[in-house]
Amino acid sequence: MSEKAYRDAEGLNKSLLVPFMRSPKHYLQELQEPKEATESMNLGTALHAELLRPEVASDIYAVMKKVDKRTTAGKEYAAQFAAENAGKVIINEEQKIALDGMRENAMSHPAARRLIEEATHTEQAMFADYKASGTDHRFTVKAMADGILEGEGIVFDIKTTESATPQEFAKKVRAFRYDIQQVHYTFAATSSGIYVKEFPFIVIENVKPFGVAVYTLDGERIKRTWDEWKQAMEYYAHCHQKQDFSACYSESICELTF
């Protein structure tokens, strides 16, 4: 399944669930006006292509040379490049140098290399029905796993970041709710008949020296995250059934504890 087909398919993914957990109105905002891809995100997409689908990487991204677009030659190059690479992710030459270093170091890391090379499925789209408690209301959940080692019960995800130290990546986990991602993907996978025993994150630095680490998240934390995820899903089911995502924060004065 292509990434575009997956993006267009109906279903609640982690990227929409996280803003919903802030408020239904934030979910609606993200749904109606999704954020534009940043240069860092484009580099991440190119890296995923090189590591997981190298045979079609050239169809996914292209490298644009630095030219002076004020000149006739520069304008001609830019126009031809745009025509030849329509629909692809575009990175620049500096990013390509970083991409090569990231890919090389990822494949030099024993644990990361094993996961990538032994994956039975890569960029695997998964869909499942979530049934709200006490009702017959259902909605579709979706997730796309970077890699699956089906015989070992492993689903893994690749992340790029400036620092892959345990302390800094822990901050990223909290900030971007990678724990919610693990739970959401695990639900989608198990509902699709895929056994999940372990969910490692391959973390690759996008700045020199392009360090690589592989982490799993604390089991006790994930247990608490399951409860948080379930509560959010039940509330989403309520909003989805009523087709009302207008709620935001409390309209009364609230005491803040800290």
What are these model-derived regions, one by one?
Residues 1-142, 249-255:
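Metal-dependent nuclease catalytic cores that hydrolyze phosphodiester bonds in DNA/RNA
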Residues 143-171:
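Conserved catalytic cores of phosphodiester-cleaving nucleases, focusing on short active-site segments
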Residues 34-36, 84-91, 167-177, 218-220:
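Short histidine-centered catalytic/ligand-binding loop motif
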Residues 112-116, 149-154, 190-197:
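Secondary-structure boundary elements
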Residues 138-142, 149-153, 196, 207-210:
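Coil-to-beta-strand transition motifs
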Residues 25-29, 162-165, 207-211:
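Short acidic (Asp/Glu) and glycine-rich catalytic loops that position anionic groups and cofactors
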Residues 172-179, 184-258:
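Metal-dependent nuclease catalytic regions and adjoining charged, substrate-binding loops involved
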